[in-house]
């Protein structure tokens, strides 16, 4: 029995050393891969934060543009008035005249100031919205 234990002890020690090495190796590889996964996660989070900051800047610029539009429409209308230009729309004639009224040969009518202001505001808001949307798309595609 003593002879058997003498032959068995080196094998048991070799098995324990192998198991210890395996365990330490797997722990170090796990730590290495966990670190790589963590680094990749940090890179993605930083990229997402950077993209969000860029989108926030686009949004802030869009909000500033919208705030500036109110004075802009008034300025455009006053510039048109100072140049003696008018905003006009085409109108369809409704029928023949009985000869008692004036005749407008080009079939156009002048817009009311409030309507002109509203139309200009809508078009300028639409332009600002499209520019902001295009800037947002550019920032998201830069990713």
From Swiss-Prot:
Subcellular location per the Swiss-Prot or TrEMBL entry: Host cell inner membrane
InterPro entries in the record: I-spanin (IPR004929), I-spanin_T7likevirus (IPR016417)
One Gene Ontology term of the molecular function aspect: peptidase activity
Record-annotated membrane-spanning stretches: 8-24
Topology feature Periplasmic, residues: 25-143
Superkingdom per UniProt: Viruses
Name of this chain's protein: Spanin, inner membrane subunit
Lineage: Viruses, Duplodnaviria, Heunggongvirae, Uroviricota, Caudoviricetes
